[in-house]
């Protein structure tokens, strides 16, 4: 065997080892195409979902803008504390026997300590609960209700009675007079009704009396000629 044949065989073996088998190449290409296609499909699906989400959010924003202001904020915001001027206007006093407040029986619900004599306290106008001035003032800066009963601390406006026309004493007198007039009218109407009921009975009785009188007179008249005839016969 010559050296040329050996070189040619070596070249062919090197060539086959460098270039893969066509069947494996086709398999790898198919796998690559499937991966690219699947990745492209996932990208398209994600893009479609993104567009759909943007569309839905835009529709919701437009619908939300079209609603009235009342429906945009269905939940009320928590109320803040009172104005410092309102807090300062609340009544204060010094705890002691002269104020009518027993120091040992009253407890501040904010600091959970008993009110002592000569302590400066504040009374809430609507619920009449008593606290230390410093304690309740600190509470009212962040909350507008009583710490105990949750009643609004801000003083309520007093409703003044409407002025009445005319003196007050005239109304009962008018009522009494009208009642008296009604009773007099009722009595007169009842008496007139009684008269109208009794008058036919009295007329009937008088008519009966007249009839009896006429009958008695007729009987007397009929009996008188008979007696005259008897007297004449006796004479003859």
Curated annotation (Swiss-Prot):
The chain crosses the membrane at residues 31-51. Its EC number is 2.3.2.27. It is found in: Membrane. PROSITE patterns: ZF_RING_2 (PS50089). A zinc finger (RING-type) spans 108-150. The keyword Transport does not apply. Belongs to the RING-type zinc finger family. ATL subfamily. PANTHER family: (WILD MALAYSIAN BANANA) HYPOTHETICAL PROTEIN, E3 UBIQUITIN-PROTEIN LIGASE ATL42. This is E3 ubiquitin-protein ligase ATL41. It comes from Arabidopsis thaliana. The lineage of its organism: Eukaryota, Viridiplantae, Streptophyta, Embryophyta, Tracheophyta.
């Amino acid at each position: 065997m010559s050296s040329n044949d050996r070189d040619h065989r070596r070249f062919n073996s090197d060539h086959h080892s460098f270039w893969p088998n066509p069947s494996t190449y086709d398999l790898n290409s198919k796998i690559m195409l499937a991966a690219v296609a699947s990745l492209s499909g996932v990208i398209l699906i994600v893009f479609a979902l993104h567009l759909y989400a943007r569309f839905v959010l835009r529709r919701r924003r437009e619908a939300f803008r079209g609603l009235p202001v009342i429906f945009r904020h269905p939940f009320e915001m928590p109320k803040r504390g009172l104005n410092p001027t309102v807090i300062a206007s609340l009544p204060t006093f010094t705890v002691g026997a002269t104020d009518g407040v027993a120091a040992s029986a009253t407890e501040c619900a904010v600091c959970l300590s008993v009110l002592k004599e000569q302590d400066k306290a504040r009374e809430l106008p609507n619920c009449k609960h008593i606290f230390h001035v410093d304690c309740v003032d600190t509470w009212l800066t962040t909350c507008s209700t009583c710490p105990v009963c949750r009643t609004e601390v801000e003083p309520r406006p007093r409703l003044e009675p409407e002025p009445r026309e005319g003196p007050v004493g005239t109304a009962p007198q008018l009522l009494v007079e009208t009642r008296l007039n009604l009773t007099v009218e009722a009595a007169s109407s009842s008496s007139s009704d009684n008269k109208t009921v009794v008058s036919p009975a009295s007329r009937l009785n008088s008519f009966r009396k007249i009839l009896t009188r006429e009958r008695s007179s007729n009987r007397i008249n009929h009996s008188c000629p008979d007696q005259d005839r008897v007297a004449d016969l006796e004479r003859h």
